[in-house]
Amino acid sequence: MYSHVMLGVNDMEASKQFYDATLGALGYEPGVMDKKGRCFYRTPKGVFALSVPLDGKPATGANGGTIGFLAKTTEIADAWHQAGLENGGTTCEDPPGPRGDVMYLAYLRDPAGNKICVLHKL
């Protein structure tokens, strides 16, 4: 359904460090910067990208919005969460763990305040 997701960030260096670490914990390669100062994480199934807002205003997290990534195991989900905390992220929602008997979730806010999570289907 999606070709790409692009998040607004305020500090590209801090955000790239955060996403290189968290997406690296999920098995993805570090992001690649383009000539316009945007950062791209490309996969065969889609693109995740970071950009400083073009209008010059501060990037803000979407109120009520969350971007979710898949984790192959609960251990990978926990490693993702820890990598985020160690690289400028903050925890949000409940601690990482099962939600009912169907999924395992972990939530973070990135350095720009965007809410992201990983989901592992149990």
Predicted segments, located by residue:
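Short glycine-enriched loop/turn motifs at secondary-structure junctions
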Residues: 1, 60-64, 100
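Core segments of cupin and vicinal oxygen chelate
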Residues: 7-48
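Long, continuous compositionally biased terminal/linker segments
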Residues: 41-85
